[in-house]
Each structure stands twice: as structure tokens, then as C-alpha cells.
Amino acid sequence: DFSYMHVNDLGCMEFAGGYPKNLHEEINNYSIIAGVVARQQEFDIIHAHDWLTYPAGVHAKMVSGKPLCIHVHATDFDRSRGKVNPTVYSIEKDGMDHADCIMCVSELTRQTVIHQYHQDPRKCVAMHNAVYPLSQELQDIPRVEHPKEKVVTFLGRITMQKGPEYFVEAAALVLQRTRNIRFC
């Protein structure tokens, strides 16, 4: 019975999208919908892609009994630089506790999951983000050589945990030791 839920004139739940003021309510509503879908559809595995979807994945697992595999791009330890939000941590940990498989984007993230969230290393695997190798045509393009200079390029996301401020901080540390580096 979902009579307590707010629905529109068509009897549908409306989602705000983005990061609304009622984010946790949105996460809960999404979880309810996942449970309904899990009861009605046939599937083999549940994949929850980052902490916002972990409650939905857990709910679908409880309803269906199917295995839950979660994807961890970053933890709140990474995003907050150690100033962890207890609510977010709780959601992340609950998702990890219920997961049958935890896919982490790096070995560093895997170690964070194991040690900060107390997860069994046997169910945690590092699955690195990757790119396709350059085609031979691109590899054959002549490059300007700077034999005495090393080049470091920022390719991160413009967010706190991967943002340019880390690049600038790292550049300052490197330049304290050597000057033959170009940052771009």
C-alpha cells in the first residue's frame, strides 16, 4: 500500500531529479519503485551504480532474492576529504553489506571499501576505468620532443575529489623538487 506516497493526477510518483532539498526522500521513493519493478520483472542480477542507488538495489534484492552487485566510483571518504557525512556513510555501508559483489574503480577505492566500510576482500574487486588504445594512425602522428622536460596533464573531473585543486597542489609539491616539468 503506497497510499501515503504523493502521486500526481495520473497516479504516478514524480521525481525532482538532480539534488533536491529532499534528496533522501527521493532516494527512498526510487527504492520503492525498484521494489515494485523487482516484483514484476524477470532478471538475473541487480546492479546499483553508486550510493544514490544502493537503497534501491538493496530493496530489489530483498524483494527478489537476486544477487546485488554494486559499483563504487568514490566513497564519502574520497568526496569529503575525510569529513564523512554519517547519513551518506550509512547508506554506502548498508549497500556494501547487502552486496554480493562490490566493483571498485581502483585498488585504492577497493582498500577504502575494505578498511573503512569493513567489507570482505573476497567480494571486492578493482575494475579500472579504461580507454581504448590509440589507433596506429594516431600513434604515428609526429610529436614535438622536449627531451629535458616532462609533461603532466590534468584529465580529472571538475569535482572536489578529483578536481583541479589536487592537480595544483601536486604541481606545487613537484616544483619544490624539480623545475623540468610542464603542467597543462
Task: For the regions a language model picked out, list residue spans one by one.
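A conserved catalytic-core segment of Leloir-type glycosyltransferases
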Residues: 1-41
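Nucleotide-sugar donor phosphate/pyrophosphate-binding loop at the beta->alpha transition
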Residues: 26-33, 66-69, 77-94, 133, ...
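Membrane-proximal helix-turn-helix segments that form the acceptor-binding/catalytic region
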Residues: 35-40, 62, 85-102
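Active-site proximal beta-strand in glycosyltransferases
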Residues: 45-47, 54, 58-78, 126
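A short beta-strand/loop micro-motif in the catalytic core of glycosyltransferases
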Residues: 46-47, 97-107
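A structural signal for the hydrophobic beta-strands that form the central parallel beta-sheet
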Residues: 104, 126, 151-154
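Carbohydrate-associated surface elements
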Residues: 108, 130
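Conserved donor-binding/catalytic core segment of Leloir-type glycosyltransferases
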Residues: 143-172
